[in-house]
């Protein structure tokens, strides 16, 4: 291949993109894409040319519906029955807090000793729920509630005692560098 033929081929074919970018910005300036309000990007689509549009990434959200369906089929195998007219469910924890379910869906299977609760549980302190739940409790529950209240009070006392220990430590002065207080005692 001779040099003249190679030069003609290179002239006919665009090699590189630098020239095309210069051409784009010259066209943009001539079309007043840069206005007083700022850069208007919608003009770029007309100038740049053909191409495939950007495709949005499809996000797959894993729904809890599939988990609920699996749970429902398992509960059907256990022959659970829905229990109606339950307004709230409270689960007492050892640390004195309560998991409170307002208007839950409850299913039960007495032969297999299985109960299922559906709903949003909120963790609340025992003191928030005490006035409203006292009339719902039986004698056995009242005894366990007393034990729970005692443990809650003990926890509060321990937390208060730890706070006082921290206050006592604040009264002790820090040693100043270079001074030795033991030599003064002797």
UniProtKB/Swiss-Prot annotation:
GO terms for cellular component: cytosol; nascent polypeptide-associated complex; nucleus. The keyword DNA-binding does not apply. The keyword Zinc does not apply. Gene3D superfamilies: Nascent polypeptide-associated complex domain. InterPro entries: BTF3 (IPR039370), NAC_A/B_dom_sf (IPR038187), Nas_poly-pep-assoc_cplx_dom (IPR002715). Residues 65-130 form the NAC-A/B domain. Coiled coil: none annotated. It is found in: Cytoplasm; Nucleus. Its main location: cytoplasm. Residues 167-186 have a biased composition (Acidic residues). Keywords: Cytoplasm, Nucleus, Protein transport, Repressor, Transcription, Transcription regulation, Transport. GO terms for biological process: protein transport. Residues 153-186 are annotated as: Disordered. Belongs to the NAC-beta family. Component of the nascent polypeptide-associated complex (NAC), a dynamic component of the ribosomal exit tunnel, protecting the emerging polypeptides from interaction with other cytoplasmic proteins to ensure appropriate nascent protein targeting. The NAC complex also promotes mitochondrial protein import by enhancing productive ribosome interactions with the outer mitochondrial membrane and blocks the inappropriate interaction of ribosomes translating non-secretory nascent polypeptides with translocation sites in the membrane of the endoplasmic reticulum. Part of the nascent polypeptide-associated complex (NAC), consisting of egd2 and egd1. NAC associates with ribosomes via egd1. This is Nascent polypeptide-associated complex subunit beta. It comes from Aspergillus fumigatus (strain ATCC MYA-4609 / CBS 101355 / FGSC A1100 / Af293) (Neosartorya fumigata). The lineage of its organism: Eukaryota, Fungi, Dikarya, Ascomycota, Pezizomycotina.
